[in-house]
Amino acid sequence: MASVLNEQSLQQLFISARTHHTWKNTPVSDEQLKQIYDLFKYAPTSVNCSPARIVFVKSAAEKERLLQCVNPGNVEKTKNAPVTAIIGMDLDFYEQLPKLFPHVDAKSWFVGKDTFIEQTAFRNSSLQGAYLILAARAIGLDCGPMSGFDADKVNAAFFPDGRVKVNFLVNIGYGDESSLMPRQPRPSFDEACRIL
């Protein structure tokens, strides 16, 4: 049976963690990005479909291409982030199911069912993007997820073959805590949940 995480871990992953918009001038290494993936890849997805495809944008040239795709309000925060992760969803994810879920013919559940494919890819790549945020926080990084961008432009620039489509973006780095606003309220348990 798994043990309960200590208070420091819970604070780092959830309670004290914040969405960051400004960043310290501290680089994020390729090894850290690999570590993030090697953590979140183990988190669950439907039939282990693992549809997320991540582009970690670090170089100045590629960051400039990405800046042409984001909404004006997201330009500075993206420009100054050491890394921006493009969370994509592979619409051909089911082709990997014979390897990823070999004990049944799960691939046949998806072939020719475009709506089901897109729903599954979107839902599970969203899960994986959230797992990425937690993995980044777990290794001491901060994140700033964003949905303010032109999806067609992102797809044309970074996924031109049409097989992968962007879901959302996540800036990653070491956040500048001095620029954080006070934490905003959240719905209470009774407002958000029911026990039946």
Curated annotation (Swiss-Prot):
Keyword Repeat among record annotations: no
Keyword Flavoprotein: yes
Gene Ontology molecular function terms on file: oxidoreductase activity
Cofactor: FMN
Highest taxon of source: Bacteria
Protein name from the UniProt record: Putative NADH dehydrogenase/NAD(P)H nitroreductase Pnuc_0932
EC number: 1.-.-.-
Stated family: Belongs to the nitroreductase family. HadB/RutE subfamily.
